A protein has these predicted regions:
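Extracellular/periplasmic catalytic domains that process cell-envelope and extracellular macromolecules
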Residues: 105-106, 303-304, 401-405, 493-496, ...
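Flexible loop/turn segments at secondary-structure boundaries
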Residues: 76-78, 120-123, 290, 318-321, ...
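Substrate-binding clefts and catalytic carboxylate motifs of secreted carbohydrate-active enzymes
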Residues: 7, 13-17, 161-164, 411, ...
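Secreted/periplasmic carbohydrate-active enzymes, especially glycoside hydrolases
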Residues: 1-345, 475, 584-585, 614, ...
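Soluble or luminal CAZymes and related metallo-dependent hydrolases
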Residues: 46, 330, 390-394, 435-440, ...
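Active/binding-pocket-proximal capping segment
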Residues: 365-368, 376-377, 598, 675-678, ...
Length: 810
């Protein structure tokens, strides 16, 4: 690879990207360190050339009528040359590009050149021409280039508009014909599943086929082999119209059942010879969105195999700014942490790129339903005839590639555009509103009706159903709620709303100090308001906002490490307020998808897992508040009423109301215990009650008034027991944490085999176990505990150099 102006050739990996090649050969500094992002961005003012010489042996393709050069992904604008002949120009990162090259290939050595054009120059020229507006955190003109928008900067992402050949390049030989697409539809009825194959065959020119003795498409047929999860194979010959699966094993989301997968193989045959094969794994399930008018408005819930399921998860963004660093193993690790935290859903946000096949393979295996946005976000687009043709093929390519996956729950038109276009945000001319409707309510539905009519389509997120009909209506469809954080409202604000499906809501925190130390080598920069820390905070004023919320809840930390710890507790408690409230109101609300799961670089953001895969407090909280059976407390306290203690009539209610929610297909009988305790954990009052919790339900207990409780020196603990084990627990205080009179819990920690044991002499709030030497993932962390011992299993990592702290230490 080289900068074509400098002709400084360096080795490059394919699949790969320009930045990764430059970084590996010392041609650029780490773009994540300090403000090196500026230097990295400037490098993309240039054009770059990839060049390779490969051997082509005619004997390997002797039976082929045509040879295709296939690019699964080029980022983004490129000219492609084979042996000096221009094959074409490409301009869409999200498409698959194929070129017939049979007549250009030479037996022996061949030269392939791909010239990647500057995305910055293209966007600048397009903006000058069209003046379209979009997200202010990104490069002007980003909407005119079918490139992952986050690369141009976002309010959590660096501006690193990389380029390259980020997916495989292959030579495909076609003998007589090939399978253009295979669509396996499912019919679920009376406990049986029928598979209905729709097979499209692309034939080579009939004259060429006849010259080889075939009679074109008339001589072609396909055979289907279905391999059950236990390995049993069933074969259907002669182009079957349908295949009945006996004793079908259904696929379920995580927490509701298993994820058995059937392998379907379609062999295209010309006579007795197999000329092409399609092989994928599918899950047998009926999956759609349930919408029904009700007393509050209209329901919006995932319906799986006849059951309405509460969606629990987070919004997924691309895993790295440098795509060469992504891998199946890295994605597996991230999605495994979702399963560990009891997710059943992830939403793929529309400002990135359509995920790799392996992303969906892993979601199929792990039981994670995928809300899949089309790749449009926070902008308006110029719908020229050329742009329309380009995105239509983009839709076709990705729908055909992903539609067979069991985990694909719905397609969604875009991120936040219906809402903002209705408000007039970014709109500069009337045609932009018309074009919006054409794109998301005509073009995409047309393509889906042809290529994937069985998957539910939703026009935007948020939306109430489209056509600018009150998007973000709390009583219909999905909602993005940002009054907490962007609107500076307190966490108690969450409890004022009963959204049908919350697909975005969030709160920021700092990642671990260990993560932040990778972006600076100056200890003075480890300060919330230093240049480097604010350079790695892309939501303007975000660090100050964290501090503002912090002063309301906690005493101001004395050091940076405690500041990071307190910021993570704020984030975790804020999202907990929302999720527990939504789950307590199951039936009315049927989804809690927080913003966001992950990061694409080391940054202060809304994520629950940072760039290096380290869990923040929020991810441990998520493991608890997404538990299949969860006990939670709706308390009334000083915090919930936002009372001012300096007012003349300062008073507030002190009460608890417990709730058990059950997101399983089994009824549960649980013993709920609660107690009023002093700060040394001594019990002052305790009660218990057996509770029957039906399948897929939330059950309230009676409200308990606690007018005499000392809000500075007493707290309530609560536990849910089943089969003599605690399955869910927590505590609640009735003042702000900064006012509560915590005793020194005298925390001590030791290792006992594969467990860590924490001992406390008094009530300890939000106990953090951390390892200064190695990354740890634990069965539980950032937990509340009464006096005594608490044992936590080690899931990953080595427990060397353990430290422990609680809110008392802030």
């Amino acid at each position: 690879m080289c900068n074509i102006r400098q002709l400084d050739w360096i080795p490059a990996q394919i699949p790969g990207d320009i930045y990764a090649a430059l970084l590996k050969t010392g041609k650029m500094p780490d773009p994540f360190f300090g403000d090196n992002e500026y230097q990295a961005k400037a490098l993309m003012e240039e054009d770059y050339e990839y060049r390779t010489v490969f051997n082509y042996e005619e004997a390997q393709f002797k039976d082929c009528q045509e040879v295709i050069l296939r690019f699964d992904g080029i980022d983004t604008i490129a000219d492609i040359y084979l042996n000096g002949c221009c094959l074409g120009k490409v301009d869409n990162m999200h498409r698959i590009w194929e070129f017939p090259v049979g007549e250009l290939l030479e037996n022996g050595k061949n030269t392939l050149r791909v010239i990647i054009r500057s995305p910055l120059k293209f966007m600048a020229e397009a903006f000058k021409k069209y003046k379209n507006r979009g997200n202010e955190d990104t490069i002007e003109g980003f909407m005119h280039l079918r490139k992952a928008h986050y690369m141009c900067g976002w309010d959590w992402g660096a501006c690193l508009p990389d380029g390259g050949i980020f997916r495989p390049v292959t030579l495909l030989g076609i003998e007589t014909a090939r399978l253009d697409s295979v669509y396996i539809r499912q019919v679920h009825k009376d406990g049986k599943v029928l598979l209905v194959p729709e097979v499209d065959v692309e034939t080579v020119d009939e004259e060429e086929s006849e010259a080889d003795g075939y009679e074109g498409a008339q001589a072609l047929e396909y055979q289907v082999t279905v391999t059950a999860p236990n390995g049993t194979k069933t074969i259907w010959d002669d182009c079957p119209d349908e295949m009945e699966i006996e004793n079908p094993q259904l696929w379920w989301p995580n927490g509701l059942g298993e994820q058995p997968l059937y392998q379907v193989q379609v062999d295209l045959k010309a006579g007795d010879k197999i000329v092409d094969t399609w092989c994928r794994k599918i899950g047998l399930r009926a999956l759609t969105m349930h919408r029904e008018k009700d007393q509050w408005g209209e329901s919006f819930a995932h319906e799986v195999n006849g059951y309405q399921v509460f969606a629990m998860g987070a919004d997924y963004i691309p895993e790295d700014n440098l795509l060469q660093r992504t891998s199946r193993e890295r994605t597996r690790e991230l999605l495994l942490q979702c399963k560990r935290a009891n997710f059943n859903t992830v939403r793929v946000w529309g400002g990135g790129y359509y995920p790799e096949d392996w992303f969906f393979d892993l979601c199929d295996e792990l039981g994670l339903m995928v809300w899949q946005d089309f790749m449009f976000a926070c902008s308006v687009y110029e719908l020229t005839p050329e742009f329309e043709a380009n995105i239509r093929q983009e839709f076709i390519d990705n729908i055909k590639r992903l539609r067979h996956h069991a985990s694909l729950a719905l397609w969604c038109g875009n991120n936040e555009m219906e809402m903002f276009v209705k408000q007039g945000t970014w709109v500069t001319k009337p045609t932009e509103m018309r074009d919006y409707l054409f794109m998301y309510e005509r073009i995409i539905p047309e393509v889906l009706s042809e290529y994937d009519p069985d998957t539910f389509y939703w026009p935007a997120s948020p939306s109430s159903g489209g056509s600018f009909d009150e998007p973000n209506d709390p009583n219909r469809g999905d909602v993005h709620y940002w009054e907490v954080w962007h609107g500076n409202k307190p966490f108690s604000e969450y409890r004022k709303y009963f959204f049908r499906y919350a697909s975005e809501f969030g709160f920021q925190s700092f990642p671990s100090v260990k993560t932040l130390e990778t972006v600076t080598d100056d200890p003075k920069e480890l300060n919330p308001f230093s240049y480097v820390m604010e350079k790695h905070q892309r939501n303007y004023g975000g660090n100050g906002k964290i501090a503002k919320y912090m002063q309301a809840a906690y005493r101001y930390p004395e050091n940076f490490s405690d500041f990071v710890y307190a910021s993570q507790l704020l984030q975790a408690d804020g999202i907990r307020y929302g999720v527990e409230h939504y789950r307590r109101n199951r039936g009315r609300c049927m989804g809690a998808i927080y913003w966001q799961l992950n990061d694409c670089w080391p940054v202060i953001s809304w994520s629950s897992i940072d760039y290096y895969g380290r869990w923040k407090a929020l991810h441990y909280y998520a493991k608890r508040f997404f538990a299949s059976v969860m006990l939670s407390c709706e308390e009334q306290s000083w915090m919930t009423v936002e009372a001012d203690m300096n007012r003349q009539h300062f008073e507030f209610e002190k009460s608890i109301r417990l709730n058990v929610t059950n997101e399983t297909l089994d009824a549960h009988r649980v013993l709920v215990k609660w107690a009023v305790r002093k700060t040394d954990a001594t019990i002052l009052r305790e009660e218990e009650q057996w509770l029957e919790v039906p399948v897929l339900s939330a059950v309230w207990m009676d409200k308990v008034e606690l007018p005499q409780i000392d809000c500075f020196n007493e707290y309530v603990s609560y536990e849910a027991w089943e089969n003599d084990q605690i399955i869910s627990q927590g505590t609640v205080i009735f003042s702000y944490p900064k006012y509560f009179h915590y005793l020194n819990p005298g925390l001590a920690v030791r290792v006992d085999g594969d467990e860590i044991v924490v001992k406390a002499e008094a009530y300890a709030k939000s106990v953090e176990i951390r390892n200064e030497n190695d990354d740890l993932i634990l069965e539980d962390n950032y937990f509340d505990m009464n006096a005594g011992e608490y044992r936590v299993k080690i899931l990953d990592g080595k427990p060397d150099g353990l430290k422990v702290r609680s809110v008392y230490d802030i």
